[in-house]
Amino acid sequence: MTTIPAIDLMGRLRSGNSTAPRLTWYGPDSERVELSGRVLDNWVAKTSNLLQDELDAEPGMRLRLALPAHWKALVWALAGWQLGLETVLDDGAADFLATDDPSGAGDQHDAVIAVALPALAMRWTGELPAGCLDYAAEVRSHGDVFMPHSDPDPSACAIRTHDGRTILHSDLASGFALHHSEGARVHVPADHGLESALANALGAWQHDGSVVLTHADVALTDKLLADERIHGS
């Protein structure tokens, strides 16, 4: 099987010290979500299976993430990457759209997926546009292990950055991820944007580190930094 950095990363996250925290989210209304490597891999596998089995996603297709920097947005990016999809962060054309605001999605995508951001949401609150998929209601029914139907292409585009760089799947770890020291526990402000959150998270995870992602409404106190043991760079 052809491998790419995203697949290798998910393998590392679910093996070794798989119960250690890898992604911690602080959101509005005192929301705190912590995902170990094993739990993060589980969410990513289920999301990849939803894309592949329910939406017929294949390597080379494009997945637009109209989402803020949030733990579920990181899950979606990883799910797309291990499938070999291109992640689109701007308003460019895409086969699939994952969004927290499906009301204005239009009809230019093969599928629109509504992503409810609250951690405990079991389904979308309110009405959805016709044909829109409810991520919270659907994702839990999908398998915990992802087995790709087709090999990803390492030379295909994984993401285009805000400054116009094209990052191939083969270069996701070396050309997009930001470098962090071994085992670092990195704080990432969500208001720096999703691209920053993804680059920082990939850089931390590939060196056995972890990420604390905080919403702009969350006060970054000395107690929070101490409780989360933020360290390294």
PLM regions and their residue ranges:
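Conserved AMP-binding
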Residues: 66-70, 190-194
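Alpha-helical oligomerization segments
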Residues: 3-4, 24, 185, 209-210, ...
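Conserved short alpha-helical elements in the N-terminal third of ANL/AMP-binding
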Residues: 79-82, 197-211
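Short acidic low-complexity segments
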Residues: 85-94, 101, 216
